[in-house]
Amino acid sequence: MIRKIDVYGDRLRSRAHQLTPRLLQVASYINENREAVMEQTAMEIAAVLHTSDATVVRAIQALGFGGLRDLKQTLEQWFGPVVTSSEKMSTTVNTLTSDVDASIDFVLEGHQHTCAVLSEPGNRYAMAQAVSLLAQARQVAIFGIGASGILAEYTSRLFSRIGLPAIPLNRTGIGLAEQLITLQRGDVLVMMAQKSAHREGQTTLREAKRLGIPTILLTNATDSRFSKEASVVIHVPRGGEKGKIPLHGTVLLCLEMIILSVASTEPQRTIKSMKRINELHRGLKPGKKSG
């Protein structure tokens, strides 16, 4: 097995004694949050540490890097190549080529493993905590981007059906900012995210923290930066090991467990909401006259 050369770590260890306390704070943050730094600008790092972007750049240069771009290129080599979704699909279909049973087993085994993990005491306790938070929420916001954005939209509809107002947070750029502006104190955030500390997730967490909104994280990366900041972490395996495609049905499985649990803890609210939806639906059928 080839040993990775940790250029950044080696330089930090050899030069830490030469850094001022402020520069050492920046250098240590980068070392402890490497994945997040890959997605951050100097100004964003500075904002986290309550310092200036010039201080961030000086700290990076003090360790022998030309700047933030040079640092990121070095960290990227340390992390290794990123496996794209097309490469994951290629690995999966090549493994399962011309074997329908193997494809069926791949999905079934992935879901069976997730069911076993979700039923473990630790996850049951985490889901109970999540349900307790959601039952008292003013509104629930469901965060997910990419394929998880579709789950966020669907889940928000399910929560609304049982009488708990819900909104999806599933856009990027200014679109996500427009969704985030609707958050208020008393809300609860349900977040679907993995290891990559992307800007959308970081911004959403910062806004939730500013408003005192608790976060429920559904993830397979229980050691991620998001996991450290969440109020409740539910471990949801996705079956994407060895470069294969991840399964999104496993996340939906967990979401439906949570929604049904919330509905059962507030039965009167759930029944009242469902009855009202049916009444409104009847009024929308052809031939119905408005009063």
Label each residue range with its predicted role.
Residues K4-G9, H17-Q18, L24-Q25, E32-E39, ...:
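HTH-adjacent hinge/linker in prokaryotic transcriptional regulators
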Residues V7, R11, Q25-Y29, R58, ...:
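Alpha-helical scaffold segments in soluble metabolic enzymes
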Residues A135-L253, I259-E266:
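Glycine-rich phosphate-binding loops that contact phosphosugars or nucleotide phosphates
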Residues Q268-G291:
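A short, charged, Gly/Pro-tolerant segment at domain boundaries
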